Regions:
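Short, charged/polar connector segments at secondary-structure boundaries
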Residues: 1-115, 121, 132, 174-189, ...
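A short, basic-hydrophobic beta/loop patch
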Residues: 104-119, 125-157
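Long, charge-rich alpha-helical interaction segments
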Residues: 199-205
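Charged, amphipathic alpha-helical linkers/stalks
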Residues: 149-198
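Short phosphate-engaging motifs
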Residues: 126, 180, 207
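Glycine-rich loops and low-complexity Gly/Arg-rich segments
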Residues: 87-89, 133-136, 144-147, 163-168
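Extended alpha-helical scaffolding regions
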Residues: 206-209, 213-216
């Protein structure tokens, strides 16, 4: 009963966040619900699919749903919009109970990835609960939709990501400057074609999560640069090992010391 009461309280907080996001989007003239991949893509925009199997999907890169369905149940930030006493609310609270208990939310979601962003086919409520609790990842069966190649910077960077993904198996590494992956490998002391071990991947992901949190607290998400771009700039000055050695305040100050270089990525030529 304690978990049940706790989950209802959490739902009310999530509902409040959802309604706030919905209201702000409406006031700003933005679409107030989840993005729908089927409404973004047309046949001439895609160049095939790749089944990636089961991977750890970064929660912050899940931005919408595959098809319209019940998108009006969620605000654009995946927070709920329906009352707590609805069937939707009851199911959300059950998932919350599982997350807070020993069981956890273990069933993988199913989703599609396009240009580094994920769209859920099955498991929206699981994503909602874990986004509310600010989880880092969720297991998911992923189908990658390849964009038609065009000589734009965004598509060039994405195809570079696709090329290096088998080496890193990390979706956190999305850059806005072509040529960034070889520079990252070099900064970490690896050869360009080095395949990361599971330990290297786990260690990097843990440190990067810490770096990304500090970057976001500085409102880095408002910049044109991604957190991966910011890391690459930071690595010009500091060794990667320092991320876990610094205190939170030291890490923040170190990012601030290269902030102008990070900001310049939005308008500068590739570095």
């Amino acid at each position: 009963m304690e978990h049940q009461s706790e989950s209802i309280n959490h739902y009310q907080q999530a509902l409040k966040a959802g309604r706030k996001a919905h209201r702000q989007n409406v006031q700003q003239g933005n679409y107030p619900f989840l993005q729908v991949l089927d409404e973004i893509l047309t046949d001439n925009m895609t160049a095939g699919e790749v089944h990636l199997g089961l991977i750890e999907v970064p929660i912050d890169k899940i931005v919408g749903t595959k098809s319209r369905g019940r998108t009006n149940a969620f605000a654009s930030n995946f927070m709920p919009l329906l009352p707590a006493d609805s069937e939707f609310g009851h199911k959300w609270c059950q998932l919350c109970d599982a997350h807070l208990g020993d069981e956890g939310i273990r069933d993988p979601i199913s989703c599609y990835e396009y240009l580094g962003r994920f769209y859920v086919q099955e498991g929206n409520k699981r994503v909602s609960v874990l986004k509310y609790f600010e989880a880092a990842t969720i297991p998911g069966y992923v189908i990658r939709i390849l964009p038609v190649y065009t000589p734009t910077t965004e598509i060039q960077c994405y195809y570079e990501f696709v090329h290096y993904y088998p080496l890193t198996k990390l979706y956190q590494l999305l850059f806005t400057q072509p040529g960034s992956f070889p520079k990252l490998q070099a900064a970490l002391g690896y050869e360009t074609d080095h395949v990361w071990t599971n330990d290297e991947r786990r260690h990097f992901a843990s440190a990067f999560y810490r770096f990304e949190n500090a970057f976001r607290k500085l409102e880095g998400e408002t910049l044109a640069a991604t957190s991966a771009d910011a890391l690459l700039v930071w690595l010009r000055v500091f060794p990667f090992s320092r991320i876990c050695e610094m205190s939170a305040s030291e890490l923040t100050r170190s990012i601030q010391s290269v902030w102008q270089d990070i900001k310049s990525l939005g308008s500068a030529d590739p570095i």
